[in-house]
Swiss-Prot record:
EC annotation from Swiss-Prot or TrEMBL: 3.6.4.13
Top-level taxonomy: Eukaryota, Metazoa, Chordata, Craniata, Vertebrata
Disordered as annotated region, ranges: 1-27, 150-199
Species annotation: Homo sapiens
Residue ranges constituting the DRBM domain according to the UniProt record: 53-121
Name this protein carries in UniProt: ATP-dependent RNA helicase DHX30
Record's subunit section: Identified in a complex with TFAM and SSBP1. Interacts with AGO1 and AGO2. Interacts (via N-terminus) with ZC3HAV1 (via N-terminal domain) in an RNA-independent manner. Found in a complex with GRSF1, DDX28, FASTKD2 and FASTKD5.
Length: 1194
C-alpha cells in the first residue's frame, strides 16, 4: 500500500547511501512557507540572485549531460496548500533530491523551487561565484563526487556568446536597440501556456502605454566604446553604491540577453603581485572596459565591476534602487517597433471589377445622403404589428384562441367530469397514502380563502403529485369541475413530463386526457375544463405574453420555488402584479426547503402551511468513514488539505471506487450518484464501464442531465430486470425535481455547478462550488423514499458545518440581459431597474444597468429603454439576445439555415465530449472545420453530415458516422428539435413565409447559405461587440518580452483562447479578426471556447455603430468609432465606396425589420438580391493572412 511518509523516508535513506557527501541543508523556504502563507524574504532574495532559475537549472543539466532539455531530470509536482500553491521539485541529477517552493500561482511556486535548487547547485560547486556555467569536462569531474554514472556524459560544443551582442555596433548600445531580439528567450520562454497565462500578460500596445507614463528617467544613449580607469577613490565610492557588483552585472546581462550565464559577456583579467590590477571587459550593451586595483584579486575585480555598474546606471540600464530592469525594458526599441507595426492599418485592395459593380449598384439604388439608421423605437402608428401574439388571447391550457365557455357548456362539462370521477374509484384506491393526504382540507380551504398560499413540504410528502389532484377532486365533486384549470410549473423539462405522467397514471384511464404537459420541443396539452397542465417556467412566461391576465386559468402552482432559479423569481414578479388583473386566480407556491417566511412576506403575509414528510432511516457516511471503508487511509490527509482551503476538486476515481464498493458489499437496490456536471457524469460513466468490462450487462448505468432528451431518460424511472443493478449518475436535477423510487444508496459529491457573473470583467463563469446544507438534506432524502437507505457524503463532517444554509438566488449571480428583455416584453412601460426592484431579492442595480447597456449596444433597446424594431423581432425567438439577433440578420441576409444550426449547437453541444476525449473531439472539430477557421462551421458540417446519413444510410452507417465524428445522438435529436422550434419562432416574427422555408435549401432565406464568409460575417454581426483582434507579441507580469507569442484583444481587454477552439493551435490565420459567443472566467483568466475567423470587410460592413474616415484625397483610413480593433486603409475611392455600401446594407436591414420580410415588394426584393450578391462576391476576396509566429508551447 502506498504511503507518502514511507516513500519520503525510503527516498531519504536511498540518498544517504547513494552520496558520500552529507545531504545539503535546505534553506528555510524550501521546507515551509511563512506562517501566513506568504513567501519569505529569503525566497525573494533567492529570486534576485537567480532571476531565471528554471532556465539556469535546464542549462546546467543540459551542459553537463549534452542534452537539449532536462525535462526528465527535473520533475515538478504540484500540490494545493492552505493558501498557496506548493511545488515539489524532484531533481534526478547529479543525485536525487527534493526541494519545495510556494507561490500564489503555480508558476511562482515553480520558480521558488527552482531558485532553491539553484542555491543547492551553487553550494555543490555546480555554478560559479557569478552563477556562471562550467564546461562539460569540469562537470564530469564534479559528477564523480556524487556517484553519477559516467556513461551518460558526452562532450558538447563550447557555448559561444550570443552573436547579436558580440557584434554590437557602438552606435546601438541604447537598451532595446537592434539585436535585442535575435536570440530566443530560452527554455523559460517555452513554459506551458496555461501556466504562463496564470502569471498574467499584457500586449505590446498596453505595455508601451504604461512605459510612457512611467516616472523613470528615459534611457540614455552612449556613443562608441569606452575605456574607464578612474582613481581609487571613485572605485571605492562605486563599490559603496553597489556592494555586490558582480552579482548585479550578471543579473542585468542574464535578464537583458535571456541567457543562463553572463560569463561570456563579462570577462576579468587580473595581473600583479602585491597590488592587483583587474581589467573587466564588458561586451554588453557594447564593448566597454573598466580597470581598478586592489590588494587582493577579489577586491580589484569588485571595484572594476562596481565601476561597470555605475556606467550602466548612467545609461539607464539599472533602476533607481540599483536593481536590473525587466527584459521588456531592455528591449524597448523592439517593442516600440512591434507596437508601431500593430498600429498600422490593414491595407485593403478590392478588385476593380467589383468596385465598378458597387458603383453601378449605388448609382442605380442611391442611398440618400440624409439617410441615417434611425433609433427603431416601438411606435404603434408606424410599425407593423409583429408576431401572432398581438392577436386574440390564447388559451393558456390548450394554446388555441381563448373563448370563455358558455354557461350551458360549462354545466354539461362539469357533469361529465363528475361521472368520470365516480367511475375511477378502484384506481384511486391503488394510490398509496401520502403524508399530505391528512392535510387536504386545511390546504384546500387555505387556497380557497387566500389568493396566495405557501406550502412547505418535506421530501416525500407528496405535494407535487397530490395537491393538483386534490384541487381537481374538490372542484369536480362540487359540480364545478369545468372551472378548474390548473397550471403547475416545474423548474426542469424532465420533472414536468415525469410528474404529468405520474399524475395521469394515478387519475386513471377515464381522466388521463385531463392531464398534460408542455415543455420545450415536446407538448401534449390536456383538454380544457378540469385540466392539469404541467410545464416549465419558461413555457408559462411565453403564455403570459399572449394572455397577460391568464384568463381561463383557476390556479397557478409554482413548484420547487425554493430553488430560486432566475425564471421562477421573474415569474413571481409577474404573478404578484397579476393579482390586480385577475383577482380570482389562486396562486400556490410549493417548497421543499428554504426560507418560506420570505415568500410569505413577499406576498403580503400570506399563510404558510407546513406538511411533514415521511422518510425511512438513512445511515450517513462521511469522507473519513468512506476512505476507511475503501482502505484509502493515506488519502485522508490530502483531502483534509483540500478541506482547509475550500477547494472544490472532485476525485472521479474515488467516486468510481465507492460505487464499485457499494455494488460489491452494499445492500441490493439502485445507486444514485450526485455529480456537478456533464463532464463528471461522462467521466464516471466511462470509468465504470471500463471497470465492469464484460460484466457490464449486469448493470444499468443511466446518466441524467438536461442535455439528454426526455425519450432517452425514461429508463431511470423503470425497475431494472432481476439481477441488474441500476446506477444513476445525475446533477442536482435529481434532488427534488424527479423521484426514482428504487434508490437505496446515494453518493453525494457535495458539489454542483453554479453560474456567477463578474461585473468587472462582464463575463460569466460556471464554477464548481459546494452545495448548501439544504441541498445535502435533499440528497440524503433520496435514499429513504421507499425503504431504509444509505448516504455517502464525499466530504468530511466538518465541511457540512461550513456550508451555507441555502443557495444564493440565481438572479443575484447571473447576467441579466435575457431577464431585461423579458421585462420589456411583459411590461414595456417600466424601466428595467424599476421592474427588477420588485423581485424577492433585487439584483445589483449596476448589473441591471450593464444588461441595459448591452441591449442598447446590440440595438435591441433604444436610449429610453423601449424595444426597437429589431428588439420586437428578437422577442419571438427563445434564445440569448445576441444569438436571436444573428438569426434575424441571417433571415435578412438569406443564409438562415446554417445560422439556425450554429445557434442550436451553441445551446446544446453535439459532440460526445468528456474529460478523457477532449483532445480527440478537438481534432474532429478541426477536420470538420476544414480551412474555414471556424468552430461554428464545424457544427454546421457535423449536423449536415448527420442529416445526410439519416436521409440515405442504414443504421450501421449512422452509428459509424457518430463514432467517427464523436457525435452524441441524443444531442443531435435535441438540436433538430431546436431548429424546428426556431423555425416556428422566425415564422411568428414574420421573417419567413412558412416555417419549412427555414431548412429548405431552395428557399430565398437560404440563397447564400453556402457562402461561408457571409455566414461567419452575419454571425459576427449578431454577436458584436464580441470581436477579437489577434496581436503579435506580449509582455509577462515578470516583464519578459515574448515577441513570438500572440495576444487576443477585445474591446474590453485581453482574453485567452481555450484549447477547445481550433484557432488556438492555428499557425496561420486567414484573418486577424475572430468572433465568439461566450467568454468564461476560470482561475482568474477569461477564456473563449468557440471562435470563427471573420473577413475584415465583414467587420467593417456588417457591424452596428458609426465609422470614422480620414481622407487626404489619395489614401484614406476607415475605422470603427467605438473601438480600436479595426483600422483599414485603401485608396480614397475604395474607402468611399465601401462606406456607401455599408450604408446600403444598413438601409436593407432597416427596411426588412419594418415590414413583413416575405411580403416586401418585388422591386425591393430585387434590390436586396443584387446587394447581397455584391457582398458575397466581395467577401470571397482575400482577408489579408496573418502568420502566428508562436513559440513551441504557445
Amino acid at each position: 500500500m502506498f504511503s507518502l511518509d514511507s516513500f519520503r523516508k525510503d527516498r531519504a535513506q536511498h540518498r544517504q547511501r547513494q552520496c558520500k557527501l552529507p545531504p545539503p541543508r535546505l534553506p528555510p523556504m524550501c521546507v515551509n512557507p511563512t506562517p501566513g502563507g506568504t513567501i519569505s524574504r529569503a525566497s525573494r532574495d533567492l529570486l534576485k540572485e537567480f532571476p531565471q532559475p528554471k532556465n539556469l537549472l535546464n542549462s546546467v543539466i543540459g551542459r553537463a549531460l549534452g542534452i537539449s532539455h532536462a525535462k526528465d531530470k527535473l520533475v515538478y509536482v504540484h500540490t494545493n496548500g492552505p493558501k498557496k500553491k506548493k511545488v515539489t521539485l524532484h531533481i534526478k541529477w547529479p543525485k536525487s533530491v527534493e526541494v519545495e517552493g510556494y507561490g500564489s500561482k503555480k508558476i511562482d511556486a515553480e520558480r521558488q523551487a527552482a531558485a532553491a535548487a539553484c542555491q543547492l547547485f551553487k553550494g555543490w560547486g555546480l555554478l560559479g561565484p557569478r552563477n556562471e556555467l562550467f564546461d562539460a569536462a569540469k562537470y564530469r569531474v564534479l559528477a564523480d563526487r556524487f556517484g553519477s554514472p559516467a556513461d551518460s556524459w558526452w562532450r558538447p560544443e563550447p557555448t559561444m556568446p550570443p552573436t547579436s551582442w558580440r557584434q554590437l555596433n557602438p552606435e546601438s548600445i541604447r537598451p532595446g536597440g537592434p539585436g535585442g531580439l535575435s536570440r530566443s528567450l530560452g527554455r523559460e520562454e517555452e513554459e506551458d501556456e496555461e501556466e504562463e497565462l496564470e502569471e498574467g500578460t499584457i500586449d505590446v500596445t498596453d505595455f508601451l502605454s504604461m512605459t510612457q507614463q512611467d516616472s523613470h528617467a528615459p534611457l540614455r544613449d552612449s556613443r562608441g566604446s569606452s575605456f574607464e580607469m578612474t582613481d581609487d577613490d571613485s572605485a571605492i565610492r562605486a563599490l559603496t553604491q553597489f556592494p555586490l557588483p558582480k552579482n548585479l552585472l550578471a543579473k542585468v546581462i542574464q535578464i537583458a540577453t535571456s541567457s543562463s550565464t553572463a560569463k561570456n559577456l563579462m570577462q576579468f583579467h587580473t595581473v600583479g603581485t602585491k597590488t592587483k590590477l583587474s581589467t573587466l571587459t564588458l561586451l554588453w550593451p557594447c564593448p566597454m572596459t573598466f580597470v581598478a586595483k586592489g590588494r587582493r584579486k577579489a577586491e580589484a575585480e569588485n571595484k572594476a565591476a562596481a565601476l561597470a555598474c555605475k556606467k550602466l546606471k548612467s545609461l539607464g540600464l539599472v533602476d533607481r534602487n540599483n536593481e536590473p530592469l525587466t527584459h521588456a525594458m531592455y528591449n524597448l526599441a523592439s517593442l516600440r517597433e512591434l507596437g508601431e507595426t500593430q498600429r498600422r492599418p490593414c491595407t485593403i485592395q478590392v478588385p476593380e471589377p467589383i468596385l465598378r459593380k458597387i458603383e453601378t449598384f449605388l448609382n442605380h439604388y442611391p442611398v440618400e445622403s440624409s439617410w441615417i439608421a434611425p433609433e427603431l423605437r416601438l411606435q404603434s402608428d408606424d410599425i407593423l404589428p409583429l408576431g401572432k401574439d398581438s392577436g386574440p388571447l390564447s388559451d393558456p391550457i390548450t394554446g388555441k384562441p381563448y373563448v370563455p365557455l358558455l354557461e350551458a357548456e360549462e354545466v354539461r362539462l362539469s357533469q361529465s367530469l363528475l361521472e368520470l370521477w365516480r367511475r375511477r374509484g378502484p384506481v384511486w384506491q391503488e394510490a398509496p397514502q401520502l403524508p399530505v393526504d391528512p392535510h387536504r382540507d386545511t390546504i384546500l380551504n387555505a387556497i380557497e380563502q387566500h389568493p396566495v398560499v405557501v406550502i412547505s413540504g418535506d421530501t416525500g410528502c407528496g405535494k407535487t403529485t397530490r395537491i393538483p389532484q386534490l384541487l381537481l377532486e374538490r372542484y369536480v365533486t362540487e359540480g364545478r369541475g369545468a372551472r378548474c384549470n390548473v397550471i403547475i410549473t416545474q423548474p426542469r423539462r424532465i420533472s414536468a413530463v415525469s410528474v404529468a405522467q405520474r399524475v395521469s397514471h394515478e387519475l386513471g384511464p377515464s381522466l388521463r386526457r385531463n392531464v398534460g404537459f408542455q415543455v420545450r420541443l415536446e407538448s401534449k396539452p390536456p383538454s380544457r375544463g378540469g385540466a392539469l397542465l404541467f410545464c416549465t417556467v419558461g413555457i408559462l412566461l411565453r403564455k403570459l405574453q399572449s394572455n397577460p391576465s391568464l384568463e381561463g386559468v383557476s390556479h397557478v402552482i409554482v413548484d420547487e420555488v425554493h430553488e430560486r432559479d432566475v425564471n421562477t423569481d421573474f415569474l413571481l414578479i409577474l404573478l404578484k402584479g397579476l393579482q390586480r388583473l385577475n383577482p380570482a386566480l389562486r396562486l400556490v407556491l410549493m417548497s421543499a426547503t428554504g426560507d418560506n417566511e420570505r415568500f410569505s412576506r413577499y406576498f403580503g403575509g400570506c399563510p404558510v402551511i407546513k406538511v411533514p414528510g415521511f422518510m425511512y432511516p438513512v445511515k450517513e457516511h462521511y469522507l473519513e468513514d468512506i476512505l476507511a471503508k475503501l482502505g484509502k487511509h493515506q488519502y485522508l490527509h490530502r483531502h483534509r488539505h483540500h478541506e482547509s482551503e475550500d477547494e472544490c476538486a472532485l476525485d472521479l476515481d474515488l467516486v468510481t471506487d465507492l460505487v464499485l464498493h457499494i455494488d460489491a458489499r452494499g445492500e441490493p437496490g439502485g445507486i444514485l450518484c450526485f455529480l456537478p456536471g456533464w463532464q463528471e457524469i461522462k467521466g464516471v460513466q466511462q470509468r465504470l464501464q471500463e471497470a465492469l468490462g464484460m460484466h457490464e450487462s449486469k448493470y444499468l448505468i443511466l446518466p441524467v442531465h438536461s442535455n439528454i432528451p426526455m425519450m432517452d431518460q425514461k429508463a431511470i424511472f423503470q425497475q431494472p430486470p432481476v439481477g441488474v443493478r441500476k446506477i444513476v449518475l445525475a446533477t442536482n436535477i435529481a434532488e427534488t425535481s424527479i423521484t426514482i423510487n428504487d434508490i437505496v444508496h446515494v453518493v453525494d459529491s457535495g458539489l454542483h455547478k453554479e453560474e456567477r457573473y463578474d461585473l468587472k470583467t462582464k463575463v460569466s463563469c460556471l464554477e464548481t462550488v459546494w452545495v448548501s446544507r439544504a441541498n445535502v438534506i435533499q440528497r440524503r432524502g433520496r435514499a429513504g423514499r421507499c425503504q431504509s437507505g444509505f448516504a455517502y457524503h464525499l466530504f468530511p463532517r466538518s465541511r457540512l458545518e461550513k456550508m451555507v444554509p441555502f443557495q444564493v438566488p440565481e438572479i443575484l449571480r447571473t447576467p441579466l440581459e435575457n431577464l431585461v428583455l423579458q421585462a420589456k416584453i411583459h411590461m414595456p412601460e417600466k424601466t428595467a431597474v424599476e421592474f427588477l426592484s420588485k423581485a424577492v431579492d433585487s439584483p445589483n442595480i449596476k448589473a441591471v444597468d450593464e444588461a441595459v447597456i448591452l441591449l442598447q449596444e446590440i440595438g435591441v433597446l433604444d436610449q429610453r429603454e423601449y424595444l426597437t424594431t429589431l428588439g420586437q423581432r428578437l422577442a419571438h425567438i427563445s434564445t440569448d439576445p445576441r444569438l436571436a439577433k444573428a438569426i434575424v440578420l441571417a433571415a435578412i441576409f438569406r443564409c438562415l439555415h446554417p445560422l439556425l444550426v450554429v445557434v442550436s449547437c451553441l445551446t446544446r453541444d453535439p459532440f460526445s465530449s468528456s474529460l478523457q476525449n477532449r483532445a480527440e473531439v478537438d481534432k474532429v472539430k478541426a477536420l470538420l472545420s476544414h480551412d474555414s477557421g471556424s468552430d461554428h462551421l464545424a457544427f454546421v458540417r457535423a449536423v449536415a453530415g448527420w442529416e445526410e446519413v439519416l436521409r440515405w444510410q442504414d443504421r450501421s452507417s449512422r452509428e459509424n458516422y457518430l463514432e467517427e465524428n464523436l457525435l452524441y445522438a441524443p444531442s443531435l435529436r435535441f438540436i433538430h428539435g431546436l431548429i424546428k422550434q426556431f423555425s416556428e419562432n422566425i415564422y411568428e416574427a414574420f421573417l419567413v413565409g412558412k416555417p419549412s422555408d427555414c431548412t429548405l435549401a431552395s428557399a430565398q432565406c437560404n440563397e447564400y447559405s453556402e457562402e461561408e464568409e457571409l455566414v461567419k460575417g452575419v454571425l459576427m454581426a449578431g454577436l458584436y461587440p464580441n470581436l477579437i483582434q489577434v496581436r503579435q507579441g506580449k509582455v509577462t507580469r515578470q516583464g519578459k518580452f515574448k515577441p513570438n507569442s500572440v495576444t487576443y484583444r477585445t474591446k474590453s481587454g485581453n482574453i485567452l483562447l481555450h484549447k477547445s477552439t481550433i484557432n488556438r493551435e492555428a499557425t496561420r490565420l486567414r484573418s486577424r479578426w475572430l468572433t465568439y459567443f461566450m467568454a468564461v472566467k476560470s482561475n482568474g483568466s477569461v477564456f473563449v471556447r468557440d471562435s470563427s475567423q471573420v473577413h475584415p470587410l465583414a467587420v467593417l460592413l456588417l457591424t452596428d455603430g458609426d465609422v470614422h474616415i480620414r481622407d487626404d484625397g489619395r489614401r484614406a483610413t476607415i475605422s470603427l468609432s467605438d473601438s480600436d480593433l479595426l483600422r483599414l486603409e485603401g485608396d480614397s475611392r475604395t474607402v468611399r465606396l465601401l462606406k456607401e455600401l455599408r450604408r446600403a446594407l444598413g438601409r436593407m436591414v432597416e427596411r426588412s425589420l419594418r415590414s413583413e420580410l416575405a411580403a416586401l415588394p418585388p422591386s425591393v426584393q430585387e434590390e436586396h438580391g443584387q446587394l447581397l450578391a455584391l457582398l458575397a462576391e466581395l467577401l470571397r476576396g482575400p482577408c489579408g493572412s496573418f502568420d502566428v509566429r508562436k513559440t513551441a508551447d504557445d
